[in-house]
Amino acid sequence: MQISRFLHIERRPAGAGATWRAVFYTAILLLLVFCGQSAVADDGWDDWGDTGTASGTSEPKIKRPFISGWWNWQYNEFSSFDQGRVTFEKELGKGSKMVTGGRFNYYTEDNNKKWKVFPGENYYFCKAGDFDFKAGLLVESLGSGDKFSFVDKINSRYFHNGLANDYDRDKKEIPGVRATWYINKHFKFSGHYLPYFTASEFPSIFSKWAYAIHKSLANELLFKGGVYNAANDADFDPQFHVELSSTYPKLEMRWHYLRMKERLPIISQDKPGIFNGSYPLDETFAVDGSVNVTEEFLMRYEFALSRNRTWTTFENGHIGKKFYSDHYGILLGTDRNLPNNFYVNVQGMVSHVPDLLTTTPFQLNETEYLSSLQMRQNFRQEKLQIEFNALKNFTSGEYVLTPKILLVKSDYLTFVFGYQLNGEGAESLGPVGQFSKNNTAVFETRVTF
């Protein structure tokens, strides 16, 4: 969490990371050697970058690297935000490949400018019999929700410009290994091992997208002499996820167990003026998948239980002492292409905290009912698209509306004109309501190559 370099913040010493580094890099080395030996046994890896002969023809088969990427520029009434990614992909044979890439962000708000250049997805993928492996800097997706998910907890996120973020593009790459065992045509077993923890990143407290709890904490430190003991937001602290999947013609089901850390800091005022930050355990049991109700109706679902989660108390702009409670999440959703080029996607969600003592930064009531809706009408062979997106919390009254017009000039260039409307409902400091003054028109340029 970004507060200020001048505030009285004490950081706890990091744990002994040398041992974990040695274990992690040794595991990666052994994985690469194992996959390399498997591939060499099959085809010798003689064709990396060379020409070969396709089966049944005299035409040479050339394996060239593939370069792709995108650049996205968003502009509104008070800020602009550039995001870009370049990816280099090289096929190595027998389904093995190497992917490397880089990303950049450039955020401008009033007179504040912030550059950030960092590695993108960088990983090595290989197959060995009924197994496949993926190791490096990963961006993974779990769950069945399109706009929101109670299961998708592998990656932290970049919250650079608040609610205007794109759900899929703002995931933070994390070092890790993924392994999958294809047991038979119906079942597979997979898992992630993540040796290094990194927390989500937030905007500066001076940003229009700064969260209310962070501004309240800064006020305590600047004007009331408070002390904040911040937890390490990056450290060698192993996390893991295991999954058993089953697939049948009309039913998909995935069972998950996640032993992760909270991606957002838990802030607790344990003594008057003494604030402690932490990233405690987030242990989740979940199931997700889909059911073919009819030939034309597919229902997606998620059910998740997070045991004894830690919650930050935040009521009327004041930070209190943390508390503990289970968390239940339910999601049902479907999408469908209708006649006349009309598309609709709808999700319903329930979030339940049975032992909610008071309001938190992200949950205001013991049980909250939410829904997301996306409708899109295509014209002129999808060159012109009118899209409406909405997220509504029926319990608190908060909502986000983002109508858009998309002008697709080519496969490489798209212009977007839209508006973002944030409704505060009954609670002005709710997760959406605190940004109700940030309603703005939006112009966006998307370039893909």
Please give the residue ranges for each predicted region.
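Repeated loop/turn-to-beta-strand initiation elements of outer-membrane beta-barrel proteins
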Residues: 65-67, 94-100, 130-133, 186-189, ...
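Detector for outer-membrane/organellar transmembrane beta-barrel domains
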Residues: 248-253, 258-260, 290-391
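Outer membrane beta-barrel
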Residues: 96-210, 246-249, 422-426
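Outer-membrane beta-barrel strand-turn architecture
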Residues: 91-94, 127-130, 183-185, 247-250, ...
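Transmembrane beta-barrel strands of outer-membrane/channel proteins
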Residues: 67-75, 100-104, 135-139, 191-195, ...
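Outer-membrane beta-barrel "beta-signal"
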Residues: 159, 436-449
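Residues that define the transmembrane beta-barrel architecture of outer-membrane proteins
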Residues: 78-84, 115-120, 171-175, 236-240, ...
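Residues on the lipid-exposed face of transmembrane beta-strands in outer-membrane beta-barrel proteins
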Residues: 86-90, 121-126, 177-181, 242-246, ...
